[in-house]
């Protein structure tokens, strides 16, 4: 699998309280190059993923404010199985690592530099993985598609 040293942004994303891990099976992976705080940008893709019934991993520079609150509420209500982690690395190295994750999972990096806006993201831009395991310190992506 592909592993990096960033864990879940919020412990509310944990799926197994005993091991304090978040495990997502047959997941979509949204890879975003920027900070996500505006929930309006995130809602269109959340709704598309929710309709598939599959879980979603969000990898972004950060997820904060109302966007994070919305993810937590959806997770707690059972509307959407979701977890968010910060992107690994910094600066140009982060860009390379996000490209690597996109390559491993068959996804696209949502980057405004490249002309992709988060609010226009579609399911076809998302990566896929058989299994994602997240602890407070690290994320492992297994069986990228």
Curated annotation (Swiss-Prot):
- EC number(s) reported in the record: 5.6.1.7
Catalytic reaction(s) noted: ATP + H2O + a folded polypeptide = ADP + phosphate + an unfolded polypeptide
The Gene Ontology biological process terms listed for this entry are:
protein refolding
SUPFAM superfamilies assigned: GroEL apical domain-like
Key words of the record: ATP-binding, Chaperone, Cytoplasm, Isomerase, Nucleotide-binding
Q: Which GO terms describe its molecular function?
A: ATP binding; ATP-dependent protein folding chaperone; isomerase activity
Q: Which InterPro entries match?
A: Cpn60/GroEL (IPR001844), Cpn60/GroEL/TCP-1 (IPR002423), GroEL-like_apical_dom_sf (IPR027409)
Q: Where in the cell is it found?
A: Cytoplasm
Which family would the database say this protein is a member of? Belongs to the chaperonin (HSP60) family.
Subunit = Forms a cylinder of 14 subunits composed of two heptameric rings stacked back-to-back. Interacts with the co-chaperonin GroES.
Q: What does this protein do?
A: Together with its co-chaperonin GroES, plays an essential role in assisting protein folding. The GroEL-GroES system forms a nano-cage that allows encapsulation of the non-native substrate proteins and provides a physical environment optimized to promote and accelerate protein folding.
What is the protein name for this chain?
Chaperonin GroEL
What organism is this sequence from? Thermus thermophilus
The primary gene name is: groEL
